[in-house]
Amino acid sequence: MIAYDKIRPAIVRGLADYLGVQIIRGNQSAEAPRYPYGTYNITTIAGANNGTRQQHADGIDRLMVRSIWSFSFLSADYDESIILAVKAREWFEHTGRNWLAEHGVVAQSTTDITNRDNILTVEYERKNGFDVVFYVYDEVQNLAETNGYIEGADITPERTN
């Protein structure tokens, strides 16, 4: 299982602390916070990985999978939205790498920053954003029975004529 209950708060807290704005999950029906703020949506929870699980001494088998998150930064001010998006992408690409690694997350790549403006009745909501591809572990307990030793046997090759 992917530990989203630990990964999600670590990513959101680290990014929010760096930017100094609130980061919320997008596409909710609750009232939005005051500008500026950021949103995230997990667009791909666990991308396919045709590899095999790694067996570890702690009894946990791990498979590295890709998780894709979309980040957008909203403001009433166009420039502020762009600046937040640029700073956020820089955090994922460089400044925040140690923070993420300490929480078991690797930001593998980021996409271009693109305009995502919305029109709200008579005015625009300025929004710019990008996607981040994370590497995360899908972990499962290894339930294989082991008895702590490997039985050996003497094998003598037979000769055929």
Language-model region placement:
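A broad, low-specificity signal marking well-ordered, structured residues that form hydrophobic/aromatic
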Residues: 37-39, 69, 105, 130
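Residues in well-ordered beta-strands of folded domains
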Residues: 24, 41, 72, 108, ...
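Small/polar-rich, solvent-exposed N-terminal microdomains that initiate assembly or binding
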Residues: 1-59, 147-161
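Acidic-leaning, charged glycine-interspersed low-complexity segments
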Residues: 91-141
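Oligomerization/assembly interface segments of phage tail-like spikes and tubes
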Residues: 61-79, 125-136
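Short amphipathic alpha-helices in soluble, non-transmembrane regions
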Residues: 84-90, 148
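Soluble non-cytosolic domains of exported or imported proteins
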Residues: 2-6, 75, 79-82
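Residue-level signal for secondary-structure boundary sites
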Residues: 48, 79, 138-142
